[in-house]
Each structure stands twice: as structure tokens, then as C-alpha cells.
Amino acid sequence: MVRSGKNGDLHLKQIAYYKRTGEYHPTTLPSERSGIRRAAKKFVFKEKKLFYVGKDRKQNRLVVVSEEEKKKVLRECHENGPGVHHGISRTLTLVESGYYWTSVTNDVKQWVYACQHCQVAKNTVIVAPQQHLPMVGNPWSVVTVDLMGPFHTSNRSHVYAIIMTDLFTKWVMILPLCDVSASEISKAIINIFFLYGPPQKIIMDQRDEFIEQINVELYRLFGAKEIVISRASGSVNPAENTPSTIKTFLSKHCADHPNSWDEHLPALSFAFNVTHLEPNKNTPYFQMFNRNPCVLECPPEEGSEGTSVFARIVAAIREADGVVENKTPASSQMENNNSDELSKSKVVKKKAKQLNPFHLKVGHEVLRQRKNWWKDGRFQSEWVGPCVIDYITESGCAVLRDNTGTRLKRPIKMSHLRPYVRESSEQDSLYLLQGSIVADHDYIGLPEIPVGTYQANILVEDATIGIADNELLISSKDHELLEYRNSKISALVEDHSSLEKQTFSLLDSSNQVLEYLS
């Protein structure tokens, strides 16, 4: 460790001189000799060169002293390869792996900060070109492509399906695919081009490398260049994607017809296009061609199986779409309210905290709860005392005094207190009330002791305290003493009007007084 203000190179020279000669360098101060001896244990000479081995003696770092050698090391570790400049962390790791000097960390930071190449590269921000999506104002201008599958392999070896949706008209085309390679998808897109022509842009939710392969195939087959773009640019509202009704119905159709699901895809596409999938809007067919198709509806003949396959498909699509439309805002609002009420009913009501269950007041004797050992996954507690309530804070905590009159440091919650009930076997229980402090000579000077099972009586509201009969005292002196005691007890009874049982026995106390006077 180099002291503050000392040259690090001089420190290494002093260590090298001490390791080589066994004596201290002339510049070494007497106060530095012990530090030189301790530091020298971390260095060794190998082939007339000083190496740092560390405390574990497992390192092997060459000690560099001169400024020229430091610059050479920094240049080699920072510029690792043609045009490659490491940052501070990587450069420092490379330097510390083979070299040592005292200020290596600061030197690496200053070297990287002063590197012109790093500063220019840091301030250069490469912004990806933003793709401007043309405004969707005409049919078949912007089309989205979604892939679904894998489904059960059909008789024609088809496993996947491609869905092309026009964002303006919601016109849908569904084609089967054998796989999801770039060439297979490009061929399906080209077949749609031959029917309706190429759109301005095609949006796909795929990675950029895969989209680039599709663009290459489309340029090779059709001559369309960079027509497919990624949906990750955020230029398309997710609500404008393929309607969920189409995907849900297609999944159900493929599951119901595992071997022939690809045979009915043209019928499914046409059925979707002539159905009102969006309320208050024309069908996709009308928006695409500005007219409605001529649909021939012939009544089924007697003895026939019923309506045609296409009619059943249209009916199933309308039924599936009607389930979605019937979910009105009022019903959805009602469901939300029901869910809110259900969630509220599931909330477990916490039991209200009993801040002062025993109605304790200033001057009452209490026991306090102390948690002092860990057992069975929780702290175990015991009741210690007695203590006297000195005063009660605004937050409802009690400040206590122990049996020696010393005030405890921390306020105690009222829920951590319980009344102290004196046993008949104890000594004289005559209380001398002094302001808000109760002094009892029975336990003055005694330490706080844990109270066990003998604490049997618990005080509750509406406590009644019996008063000893005055006939037990014969002399006038005894009578005066009893009146004094009863006057003090009556004040205590007013404070304990909510307690149920007797806090101390007056009868035993009077008997003890008689024995004392006799």
C-alpha cells in the first residue's frame, strides 16, 4: 500500500532495492520501512526482472516503472487488432493480466479518455433508416401476412397456412403451405400477385434475416424489390391485423378436418369476405369490388342431406362472429363489475389491531412482552415485569418505568402489554400513589423476572373489587389505617372501572396489617 502523496514509481524502486540487496533504499524513511518489508513479500526476482506475485503467490505480473514502457503496454492492450479499440474494463483486464504498477487503473482510464478514435466512435450514432408506410387509403395497398400451424399433415402434405389480409378492406386470402421456408412463402405470395396484383407493401412479423430472404425470392420470381417489411417497426396498429375470428375459426376447422382441411381453404376465404366481421361496416367483398356478390340460395330438396358445404361454412362463420358481436359494452361492463366484486370478496379481511384491549391507563402495573429467542420458525416471547405506565404517547404507545423507577428507553405498544395481577402469597400490597408513578416497596430492587403459569387471572371490563369489612379492625388506630387504605383504593377503582377481577386481595392485606400491629 502506497501512502498518500508518495510517488508510486519510487515505491516500486525501493521494493526492488530491498529485494535485491536486503537493505533499505537511501530515500526510504524510517516510518516506511515496515511497509516496505510487508510489500516486498508480494514480489520476486526472475531473470533479473521484478514480478508481482500477490499474497497467494499465484500471479506473475511484470513490474513496469518507466513511462515509455507503460505507454507501450497501454497501446498494446487497448488497440488489440486492426481498428479494434477496447473499453476501460477490457483494457484494464488485459493490462492487469500481465503487468503491474501502482497507478494502473487511473492510467487506463486516462488513456481511453484521451483516445481520439474512441471519442469519435462514441459520438457516432448509427440510425436505422425509418421505413415510411404509405397511407392506407385504397384497397390492396398494404397487406399483412400471417403464418399459422403446424397443423395435422393433410392428404396433400400441407402442414401450414398463410393468411394475407388487406388492411383497408379486410379482404382475406388463405393458402396452404408444405413448409415455412422463404421459397415456399414467396411462391404463395406470387400466386396472390397473379390474381390481384402486387401491393405497395407487405408487412410480416418475422425476423429481418428471414424477410430479406423472402425479398430476394420475390425479386427473382416477380421483380418486386424490397416489398416486404417488418412489423417490428411499429408502423402498423395491432388492431389492424388479421381479425381474431379468422384465426380462431381456422384453427377449429383444421382440428375438425385433420386430413382435408386444405381442401376448403378457398371456401373459407370467400365466406370470410362476404361476412360482416366488423360491425357498422360493409363486407370485405363490397369494399374490394364496390358491389355485393350474387349468392344463390336454393332450398334443400326432400330426401337430400341438407344445405351445401359452402352454406354450412358461411353459417358456421356467422355463428362464430355473432358470439363476438353479442358481447355488448353493457354486458362487458357487467362482467367487469362482477369480476371486481368477486375479487373484492376474495380479499381476506385483516383482523383489527387491538390497540388497548385491557384499557390500561397511567399508573397501572403491567407486564411487557419480550421476544428473545427463535424457535419453530418464529420468535418465542415471554412476559417480564412488573412495570408501571409513566405516560402514554400520542401514537398510543406506553412509556414504562421498571421496578427501580428507571424509565425504559423505548415506548411499548399497548398490544404488547398485559395487566399485572398480584398473588395472595406476595407481601404487603399497599400502594403509595405518588403522582403518576406507583411505588411498591414489595419489589423495589428486584430484577425483572419472567412470569409463568401462575399468572392466571386476566382483567376485563366491569371489574368489581370487594372491600374488607371494617369490623376486622378493633382499635381506632387500625380503623384510621383502614380508612386511609380504602381512600387510596377507591381512586384506583375509578381507574380500573373496566376491569373484571380483583387486582389484589384486600382481605389478606388487612390480616397482614393486624398481624403487624399485634
Curated annotation (Swiss-Prot):
The keyword Cell membrane belongs to this UniProt entry's keyword annotation: no
InterPro entries given in the database record: Integrase_cat-core, Integrase_H2C2, Retrovirus_Pol_polyprotein, RNaseH-like_sf, RNaseH_sf
Pfam families: Integrase_H2C2
Gene Ontology BP, a term: DNA integration
SUPFAM superfamilies referenced in this protein's UniProt entry, alphabetically: Ribonuclease H-like
Residues forming coiled coils: none
GO molecular function annotations of the record: nucleic acid binding
Keyword line: Phosphoprotein
Domain Integrase catalytic as annotated: residue spans: 130-292
Gene3D superfamilies: 1.10.340.70, Ribonuclease H-like superfamily/Ribonuclease H
Sites of Phosphoserine modification: 498
Name of this protein: Gypsy retrotransposon integrase-like protein 1
Species the sequence originates in: Mus musculus (Mouse)
Gene: Gin1
